[in-house]
Design a protein with these regions (language model features):
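Short acidic-glycine-tyrosine-enriched beta hairpin
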Residues: 54-75
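C-terminal non-catalytic accessory extensions
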Residues: 179-238
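Conserved short histidine dyad/triad with adjacent acidic residue
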Residues: 13-35
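Double-stranded beta-helix
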Residues: 85-152
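Histidine-centered metal-chelating micro-motifs
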Residues: 49, 68-79, 86
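Short, conserved beta-strand element in jelly-roll/cupin
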Residues: 35-50, 54, 91-93
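His/acidic/aromatic-lined binding-pocket segments of jelly-roll/cupin-type domains
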Residues: 31-34, 38-43, 61-62, 70, ...
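An accessory alpha-helical subdomain
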Residues: 124-205
């Protein structure tokens, strides 16, 4: 049996931060982008929104409610907004890449020009717990408000700034190619090879004695960019 979840995806129970409002008055997470990984939300409960930015269509906001689903490509800057008890199942392609550097938080051009300052802000949750996560979120939102202002006042400047940010992230990720390739080879690519082997083997049986995995509920949530995370990553055979 392959390790991890089907097709090498990641599943995470996400409760978007609602402990206190951000500088713009909203309960929300950090705006951030992924370099190579697609992401999706399936809403379990509550209501909110996801704000999306890309170079083709600019800014838009999609409402979220129980049963709704949204999927977006890498390079899409996104922020989750919690209006009332928003809890989602976050689905990530290429499980493990986000933890290995695939994501970058929006802190504005001044921080992007200072790698050490970026690392300091990134580490706040590890150093200060929940308060550090909220402090990091607040710093992100303060900068993100300027991007929203550009969208309203100067679309050309907005696209220039968004393009700059995505470019910074892509250049930062380039040295991590081998690390990313290893994750994909051991995850999605291995699942693809297994599926093709099963097809080649038909009509022989593909049953396996270790074909059932179980992930128990529990454990302390992790402090993520969007909120409190409970990833499904501890599996046992049953």
């Amino acid at each position: 049996m392959q390790p991890g979840l089907i097709a090498g995806i990641g599943l995470t129970h996400l409760t978007v931060y609602d402990q206190r409002p951000a500088p713009d008055g909203l309960q929300c997470g950090c705006a951030h982008v992924h370099a190579v990984t697609d992401e999706a939300y399936f809403v379990l409960s509550g209501v909110g929104a996801i704000e999306l930015h890309d170079l083709d269509r600019g800014f838009r906001s999609a409402p979220l409610g129980p049963g709704s689903f949204v999927q977006f490509s890498p390079g899409t800057l996104h922020r989750s907004v919690n209006k009332s008890g928003l809890t989602v199942l976050a689905i990530m392609g290429n499980a493990g890449l986000a933890e290995r550097g695939d994501a970058r938080i929006w802190f504005g051009p001044d921080v992007d020009a200072d790698p050490e300052r970026y690392r300091q802000l990134w580490r706040l949750p590890a150093e200060k717990g929940l308060e550090g996560a909220l402090e990091r979120r607040d710093r992100s939102v303060s900068a993100y408000m300027e991007l929203l202002r550009l969208w309203e006042d100067d679309r050309e400047a907005y696209r220039t700034e968004l393009k700059r940010f995505v470019g910074v992230h892509a250049r930062t990720m380039a040295p991590l190619r081998e690390r990313f390739q290893e994750v994909v080879s051991l995850g999605p690519a291995k699942w693809l090879q297994s599926a093709l082997s099963r097809i080649e083997g038909l009509p022989l049986s593909t049953a396996s004695s270790d074909a059932v995995s179980f992930a128990p509920e529990g454990g302390e949530p992790k402090l993520g960019m969007c909120g409190l995370l409970r990833p499904m990553d501890l599996f046992a055979q049953i």
